[in-house]
Amino acid sequence: MTLRRVLTALVALILAPRRHRRRRPDTPPIGREHYEPTVLAADAASTQVSSDSIPVATTPKGGWGEAWPAPVLAGCDEPLADEAPDLRGVWKVVDGPFVGHIERIEQAGQRVVITATGIIHDMVADGTLERGVNDVDPTGGAVSVAARFNDGRLDLFPNNMRRAVVTRYLDGDEMVWRYGPYRNRLRRLEAPTDGVQTELLKEADDV
């Protein structure tokens, strides 16, 4: 890990909310397959499709554009790792610097796939860089991130830093996403139109 890579990562982290405000608003994926994860097997012995049998997904050159890519782990029924929180679903930030951000989280075994803002970050939460995220960030810059499950959290360690820089965990029916110094609360969407009417009413009240 070089000092230059660390500084680059920190600058990108600090400027992330500004970039978020400048880009087009996120739109939720269309299709029930995004909102209804595969039913998982009762135990490892009953697994029909393991997470390791599915090729690692990567961000396409230039990002995936406006149409959400198909779920990566569709059909994978390997039970979640014992220490893993169940973060599966489509989530939208309702409070925090990244309000409006939408992301889809898939899980099976130790594997986690987070799709959002044009990127696909596919990882195995075993604490290694080799099986972590080796891809690009929303700006196109290269990233290398180790992932681990700790005390009900998904912790991410860019360049295998000692402390987690990004964390996701459940808080009741909501998810908390800490991105560096920024804390966001997310609500799970049940359909593409979930929350749209509420937002329209809020906009009308603000006029």
Go through each PLM region and give its residues.
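A mature extracytoplasmic/lumenal domain signature
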Residues: D95, A116-G118, N160, P181, ...
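Short, surface-exposed beta-strand-loop junctions and turns on beta-sheet-rich folds
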Residues: I119-D122, M161-A164, R183-R185
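Acidic, glycine-rich flexible loop segments
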Residues: V143-V166, L170
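Short, surface-exposed secondary-structure junctions/capping segments
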Residues: D135-N150, E199-V207
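Short, exposed beta-strand-loop hairpins at the edges of beta-sheets
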Residues: E174-P181
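N-terminal glycine/threonine-rich, aromatic-flanked beta-hairpin/loop signature
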Residues: D52, P97-A142
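Amphipathic/hydrophobic helical signal segments and adjacent flexible N-terminal regions
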Residues: L3-R104, G109-R111, A191-V207
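Short beta-strand-to-coil "C-cap" segments at the C-terminal boundary of structured domains/repeats
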Residues: Y169-D171, L186-G195
